[in-house]
């Protein structure tokens, strides 16, 4: 009996692969033959039947996920960062913006104005490495690496995807990634990453993030999404990084600080006037391994400007499962459709009245250190004004230490 249970368990694990129906039938025959070699009783037969159902259910689920991912792969995608790609995104209400449909009138006006106005591709080529937006981009790959390592899986991006239903042609989503490893229990689960700068991580998604994930799951027709929030802290310099470690453990636990928190290094380069990063592999556990890796990285980018090494520590890692809510989408879609009809109409009749109102800043105005109280200021094209950008810098000062 013990031998049979062990066989059944191993078959269940093996069926979490990318299988064809022929392979599934072969596995079922193996199970049947193995069971015939034992002295079965009625209880054994019940176990065999239940196991066969489990295997078939898992195989069917894997096959469905595989077909969905193949469909997402087949969706037309303009080459990233090209004018066509920016235009493609501009012609959609993307998942990260849908929450604005349910916001105040001024928030809706902002979205309508943004979608009606001609796209300015040049503004996307500008990079502010001190912004919270860039902070999130900088740590996104590292968050993915940690997620993959902790869950034994593989994440892939699928670009900006339009809703497969032609009726909702104006809705799009760009998920941070989808689990594509068929051996993983997370196969087919989506991933949304938020690299927090200062906000407290509670494990409960903000409403706009929840809406974003619902739209992503709706567009990709997948039932689950992991909401991953991380909070990284950067050391002032290498000396501060070195002092936050046990020297005796530098050859076995260099990637953890004295409190047992994971840490590492990002190598910061500039190429074509834009930053790009190389991340220390999470498998590196000693100072000597890092030194060898760093030397190879610098040599491989010979001729490209190395700026500095960024030394980081992971303070918080929170991952929460969010399930698809079809009922919510069905109740929300009429309002999303209504706003898009307004966009299409006012592209013809005029949208200038939707422009954000300019605000004159008085000399005695003070800037709140609370980001929620910072007043938004926009240019005529709907982008943040320089004054707002400066305010944001002040609000975030001291958060990158």
Model regions and ranges:
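Accessory terminal regions of nucleic-acid processing enzymes
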Residues: 1-401
């Amino acid at each position: 009996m013990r031998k049979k249970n062990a066989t059944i368990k191993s078959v269940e694990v093996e069926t979490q692969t990318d299988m064809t129906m022929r392979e599934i039938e072969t596995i079922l025959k193996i199970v049947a033959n193995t069971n015939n070699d034992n002295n079965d009783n009625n209880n054994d037969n019940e176990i065999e039947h239940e196991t066969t159902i489990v295997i078939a259910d898992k195989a069917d689920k894997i096959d469905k996920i595989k077909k969905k991912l193949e469909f997402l792969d087949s969706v037309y995608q303009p080459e990233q960062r090209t004018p066509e790609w920016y235009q493609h995104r501009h012609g959609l209400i993307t998942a990260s913006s849908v929450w604005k449909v349910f916001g105040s009138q001024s928030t809706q006006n902002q979205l309508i104005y943004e979608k009606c106005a001609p796209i300015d591709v040049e503004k996307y080529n500008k990079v502010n490495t001190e912004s919270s937006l860039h902070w999130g981009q900088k740590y996104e790959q590292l968050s993915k690496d940690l997620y993959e390592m902790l869950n034994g899986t593989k994440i892939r991006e699928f670009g900006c995807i339009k809703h497969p239903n032609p009726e909702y042609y104006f809705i799009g989503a760009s998920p941070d990634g989808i689990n594509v490893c068929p051996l993983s229990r997370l196969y087919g689960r989506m991933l949304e990453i938020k690299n927090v700068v200062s906000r407290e991580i509670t494990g409960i998604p903000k409403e706009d993030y929840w809406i974003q994930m619902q739209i992503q799951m709706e567009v990709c027709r997948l039932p689950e999404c992991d909401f991953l929030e991380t909070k990284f802290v950067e050391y002032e310099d290498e000396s501060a990084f070195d002092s936050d470690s046990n020297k005796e453990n530098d050859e076995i636990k260099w990637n953890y600080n004295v409190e047992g928190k994971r840490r590492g290094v990002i190598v910061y380069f500039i190429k074509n006037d834009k930053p790009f990063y190389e991340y220390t592999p999470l498998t590196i556990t000693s100072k000597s391994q890092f030194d060898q890796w760093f030397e190879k990285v610098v040599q491989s980018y010979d001729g490209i400007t190395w700026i500095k090494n960024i030394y980081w520590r992971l303070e918080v890692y929170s991952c929460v499962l969010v399930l698809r809510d079809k009922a919510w989408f069905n109740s929300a879609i009429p309002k999303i459709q209504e706003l898009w009809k307004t966009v299409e109409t006012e592209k013809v009749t005029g949208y200038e009245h939707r422009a954000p109102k300019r605000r004159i800043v008085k000399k005695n105005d003070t800037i709140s250190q609370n980001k929620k109280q910072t007043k938004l200021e926009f240019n005529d094209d709907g982008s943040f004004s320089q004054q707002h950008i400066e305010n944001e810098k002040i609000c975030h000062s001291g958060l990158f230490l």
